Amino acid sequence: MTSIAGVVLFPGAGSSSSHSSLVAMHDALSPLPVARHDFPYRLAGKPFPDKAPVLIASVKEHVRAFAESLGVPTSQIVIGGRSMGGRMCSMAIADEVDPLVVAGLVLVSYPLHPPKK
């Protein structure tokens, strides 16, 4: 069994990495290293999310950088998020060209279908 070295969490479309559910998970997992990241559109002050490929690339970038900062492979990192953040994590793992290999996936309020469908 792989040991878990840390967790990376991503927010939903309408919130930031300081959303109460992400903060609660962060606090509950202490002292395990936990990183919470905002997506690029949020950091740029845009009201609407980027397209999925941009969001998925952001997930991969943050997870790989976090694993590197801990000196472990991504296979020792658990990733997840709330709503859209969780969906993008699941899509990063399922990517057929460049799948993100992780220890586990946490989904909170996972959207089973795209908005308004």
Regions found by a protein language model. Give the residues of each.
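Serine-hydrolase catalytic machinery in alpha/beta-hydrolase-like enzymes
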Residues: M1-Q76, R87, M91
